[in-house]
Amino acid sequence: RQRVESSNAKAKAQISDLQEFVRRFSANASKARQATSRKRQLEKIKIEEIRPSSRQNPYIRFEQAKKLYRTAVTVEGLSFRYPGADNDVFRNLNFTIEAGQRVAIIGPNGIGKTTLMRCLASDLTPTAGRVTWVENAQPGYMPQDPQAEFEAKMDLFSWMSTWTGKADDDQLVRATLGRLLFSGDETKKSVTVLSGGEKNRMMYGKLILTKPNVMLMDEPTNHMDMETIESLQIGLEK
């Protein structure tokens, strides 16, 4: 879709330039042949039709239960080595992330991006150093592989209900599931049979309901279709 939109934009600009040339010089004897040539070029330019997708877009919006100000987390002398390994995955990392900052961890596979994320999320204990979140920080973590989140024998509705904190929030749970394209009998199926993309959508639901003021997302577009990726991008920009 993006390729077609870009191509169409260039074609429209070219059409505009050619039409302007023809308008200005078609009556000019010295430019008549060039104007005729431009008309022929115009006839050959085509604008591709962009057909609307038949797939639905989930509705993804994230809120914060508590607003976070100033510093969110401070990392000091952070090192990590897996048991039995000869080398550290990373060593002596020091950085501070402020509230409102958007930070991307970029690097080749195997460099330790996920390990660092897990240390920040308290999913792994660092070999040395410390991660200090401010008192009001409420991190929400979306792991690269959320399989461990879906091993319990629960249906989708029951799983999502565990993140509301209230026993009478059935309507909120159903609305959240619906916005993530789970409805009707589908909410009664076991979370253990979900596809990778469906698990990710359920994880978005967890973050929507728990309302963290810091989000740690490790490759959150894995297994996702373009409609969901676009919806996630919109949700993160709000």
Please provide the spans of the model-predicted regions:
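ABC ATP-binding cassette signature C-motif
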Residues: 1-6, 61-238
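Extended, highly charged alpha-helical segments
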Residues: 1-59, 63, 127-128, 163-172
